[in-house]
């Protein structure tokens, strides 16, 4: 028993002792008083000395803490004293009880005040170091979903913590919380630890060889001809022969090339790019995703992602693979452990719309707390890309045309002035995707989706089966992907350019024959056609390169003037639309488009763009710019916005 405790006991005995007899004080009692008083004074002095030394030890500054704050990947561990002697005594017990009382006060304030973790409290040194941090962590692991979401929201809105407090969250939170933070717009990037170190490459190996081995490890049987072609080409050929054979014919996912201005260009390719394109197609098969994960594909793709920071096309293909793998929920833990959530959280904040949209697709497929839909390859949500409290009341879908892309087709019309004049107001700045930049701001209650599909102008040395490129095949594939994304659950407006309008018509006809797709028909409120060749186009007859003239692709053949397939589609759609309650708006170009350097072609004349129903509006632009407004207050955009609001008026009011 400590001396201080002995003094307290002695004092208690004196206080509870009976009154002395009135006969007087005996010398023995006097000696006892002196003994007890001396003990009390001595014990008190020792107690005060101990407390002073303990206080001095507690307030001693560890100069290494400053260095630890600079290390973003530093692991903060709550240390426990190994000296059991420090865990005894009245002083230790008193401090422990005091700390418990402080925690109770803070916990009570958390219930009374909505924002209890102000800066003065964020640095309170208590037994668990940071009460605010651990209270939020506890809430984030609650069995109640609403409580979990509220905890993530509070974390994302916290910006006054120190580095180590964010690191505590990063190390202690579960995958659901980490994904939720990545999908919260205001989240601090300090919530995300650096990805774990990548395994070293094997001796005398390279990323190219590792990619080959990964591709060779994937199943090679029961594959369609496109996957077989890419796989065999990537495994057997050199970089030089690949560049010669690619010939510009492959455009999986769309590379954003101008519509017809690059007919004669032959882009170069590398073994890595061909391996990636093959792996993208393999990753659309669930069992192949398991093989990719088991063979270290997540780490290898991350290495490649880091090596090609200056090559957006390589990074986009890698993100397509990760996004496809994220469709399989049993792979989510592996994706999180490999560090991809941290990488995508940073990519979400990129000013480049394509990069942020690919990252948004990955995180949406990982987020099963707030997202029920699954976004398959080629389906990108432009708005909302983060978690939001804004109720989504309708969908607007953008379908590009031949040789188009999900983002670049819908960019603002190119302007030299926009490039030269950098200091502009936000409303006047050039946008690479006006649906995301303009429409999302004007109609925040919309979910805006843009789809991407592969197209080509020629079948020159093509190896894929012809039916894969037909309008019927593409429309069926797109309809399946859009339904998986929840299209049809809300009111829908379709916006299409060129061949994309033919796909929209075919998708609606397909949906009308399938009972499980009936909601797509019932919820369609309107369709906008930008220069859609309802009656065909002469594009295939005006190719600059002779091989395109001799071997036009199937989609080009189907776009030919007076095509039987096109006529059947037109007649069937008009019959289908007779008793349907949706609005139609047609825009048509009036200016020719330069095909190459010498030939101008009116790709879709007025008579071909006339659907036969809905308004037909001629616009003084060419085929490329019919879907690219010059600025936000231009007629093209304002009329489009007006149509969307009118078609969805009742739905947006509710």
UniProtKB/Swiss-Prot annotation:
Membrane topology: Single-pass membrane protein
Any GO CC annotation of this UniProt entry: mitochondrial outer membrane
Keyword tags: Deafness, Disease variant, Endoplasmic reticulum, Lipid biosynthesis, Lipid metabolism, Membrane, Mitochondrion, Phospholipid biosynthesis, Phospholipid metabolism, Transmembrane, Transmembrane helix
Membrane spanning residue stretches: 32-54
SUPFAM superfamilies: alpha/beta-Hydrolases (SSF53474), ARM repeat (SSF48371)
UniProt-reported outcome of changing residue 526 to E: In MEGDEL; uncertain significance
Expression by tissue: Widely expressed, with predominant expression in skeletal muscle and brain. In the brain, highest levels are found in the frontal and occipital cortices, cerebellum and hippocampus.
One GO biological process term: phospholipid biosynthetic process
Subcellular location field: Mitochondrion membrane; Endoplasmic reticulum; Mitochondrion
Function: Facilitates the transport of serine from the cytosol to the mitochondria by interacting with and stabilizing Sideroflexin-1 (SFXN1), a mitochondrial serine transporter, playing a fundamental role in the one-carbon cycle responsible for the synthesis of nucleotides needed for mitochondrial DNA replication. Plays an important role in the phosphatidylglycerol (PG) remodeling that is essential for both mitochondrial function and intracellular cholesterol trafficking.
Record-stated family: Belongs to the SERAC1 family.
Disease: 3-methylglutaconic aciduria with deafness, encephalopathy, and Leigh-like syndrome: An autosomal recessive disorder characterized by childhood onset of delayed psychomotor development or psychomotor regression, sensorineural deafness, spasticity or dystonia, and increased excretion of 3-methylglutaconic acid. Brain imaging shows cerebral and cerebellar atrophy as well as lesions in the basal ganglia reminiscent of Leigh syndrome.
Protein's name according to its UniProt entry: Protein SERAC1
Organism: Homo sapiens (Human)
């Amino acid at each position: 028993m400590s001396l201080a405790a002995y003094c307290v006991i002695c004092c208690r005995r004196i206080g509870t002792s009976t009154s002395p007899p009135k006969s007087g004080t005996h010398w023995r009692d006097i000696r006892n008083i002196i003994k007890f008083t001396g003990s009390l004074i001595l014990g008190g002095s020792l107690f005060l000395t101990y407390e002073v030394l303990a206080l001095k030890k507690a307030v001693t500054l560890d100069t290494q803490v400053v260095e630890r704050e600079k290390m973003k990947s530093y692991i903060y561990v709550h240390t426990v004293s190994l000296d059991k002697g420090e865990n005894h005594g009245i002083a230790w017990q008193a401090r422990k009880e005091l700390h418990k009382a402080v925690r109770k006060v803070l916990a009570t304030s958390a219930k009374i005040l909505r924002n209890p973790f102000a800066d003065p409290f964020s640095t309170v040194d208590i037994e668990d170091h940071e009460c605010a941090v651990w209270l939020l962590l506890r809430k984030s692991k609650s069995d109640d979903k609403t409580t979990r979401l509220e905890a993530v929201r509070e974390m994302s809105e916290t910006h006054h913590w120190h580095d180590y407090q964010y690191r505590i969250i990063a190390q202690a939170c579960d995958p659901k919380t980490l994904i939720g933070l990545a999908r919260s717009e205001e989240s601090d990037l300090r919530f995300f630890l650096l990805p774990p170190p990548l395994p070293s490459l094997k001796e005398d190996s390279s990323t190219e060889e590792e990619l080959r081995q990964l591709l060779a490890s994937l199943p090679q049987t029961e594959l369609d001809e496109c996957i077989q072609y890419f796989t065999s080409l990537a495994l057997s050929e050199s970089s030089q022969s690949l560049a010669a054979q690619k010939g510009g014919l492959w455009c999986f996912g769309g590379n954003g090339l101008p519509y017809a201005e690059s007919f004669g260009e032959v882009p170069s390719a590398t073994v890595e790019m061909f391996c990636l394109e093959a792996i993208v197609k393999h990753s659309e098969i669930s069992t192949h995703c398991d093989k990719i994960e088991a063979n270290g594909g997540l780490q290898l793709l991350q290495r490649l992602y880091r090596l090609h920071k200056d090559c957006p096309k390589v990074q986009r293909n890698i993100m397509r693979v990760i996004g496809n793998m994220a469709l399989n929920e049993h792979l989510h833990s592996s994706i999180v452990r490999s560090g991809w959530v941290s990488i995508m959280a940073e990519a979400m904040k990129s000013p480049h719309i394509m990069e942020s949209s690919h990252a948004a697709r990955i995180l949406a497929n990982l987020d099963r707390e707030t997202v029920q839909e699954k976004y398959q390859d080629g389906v990108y949500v432009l708005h909302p890309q983060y978690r939001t409290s804004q109720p989504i009341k309708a969908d607007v879908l953008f379908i590009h045309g031949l040789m188009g892309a999900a983002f670049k087709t819908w960019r603002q019309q190119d302007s030299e002035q926009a490039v030269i004049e950098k200091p502009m107001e936000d409303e006047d700045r050039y946008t690479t995707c006006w649906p995301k930049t303009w429409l999302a701001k004007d109609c925040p209650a919309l979910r805006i989706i843009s789809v991407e599909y592969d197209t080509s102008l020629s079948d020159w040395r093509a190896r894929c089966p012809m039916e894969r490129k037909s309008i019927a095949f593409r429309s069926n594939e797109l309809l399946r992907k859009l339904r998986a994304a929840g299209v049809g659950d809300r009111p829908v407006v379709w916006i299409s350019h060129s061949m994309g309008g033919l796909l929209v018509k075919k998708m609606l006809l397909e949906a009308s024959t399938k009972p499980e797709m009936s909601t797509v028909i019932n919820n369609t409120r309107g369709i906008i056609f930008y220069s859609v060749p309802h009656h065909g186009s002469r594009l295939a007859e005006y190719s600059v390169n002779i091989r395109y003239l001799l071997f036009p692709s199937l989609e080009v053949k189907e776009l030919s003037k007076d095509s039987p397939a096109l006529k059947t589609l037109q007649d069937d759609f008009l019959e289908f639309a007779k008793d349907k309650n949706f609005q139609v708006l047609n825009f048509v170009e009036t200016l020719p488009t330069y095909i190459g350097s010498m030939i101008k072609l009116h790709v879709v004349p007025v008579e071909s763009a006339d659907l036969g129903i809905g308004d037909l509006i001629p616009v003084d632009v060419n085929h490329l710019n019919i879907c690219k407004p010059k600025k936000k207050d231009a007629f093209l955009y304002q009329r489009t916005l007006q149509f969307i609001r009118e078609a969805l008026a009742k739905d947006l009011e509710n």
